[in-house]
């Protein structure tokens, strides 16, 4: 039996803006540089996101993919979901209603939220 890959869940800060993004990137970089990282970003506390936050998400996705890993998003509040939709970033990520669904998806137990056409 193949061992289950470890999934890291990272709570995003209240505001995904330039100052907070730098601090968050410093904390999350070790997770992104490991072999085949499996990461879930928990959006449940996020109240604001700007272009620096969107850029950070794209950077983290790119770094995870370079290591043959994956980054998934979970528990996105409506105000943040609008930003991700307007920037079309929502099309690049698997997005889940809850963190547990996102974690389970790494093991084949869950289905992402349907994105409207």
Task: Place the predicted regions along the sequence by residue.
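Short, aliphatic-rich beta-strand segments
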Residues: 5-14, 42
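Short histidine
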Residues: 12, 19, 102
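Amphipathic alpha-helical interaction surfaces in cytosolic regulatory modules
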Residues: 15-93
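Generic signature of intrinsically disordered, low-complexity, basic-rich segments
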Residues: 4, 48, 60, 101-104
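Short, flexible turn/loop "capping" segments at secondary-structure junctions
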Residues: 2-5, 85
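A charged, well-structured terminal subsegment
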Residues: 97-117
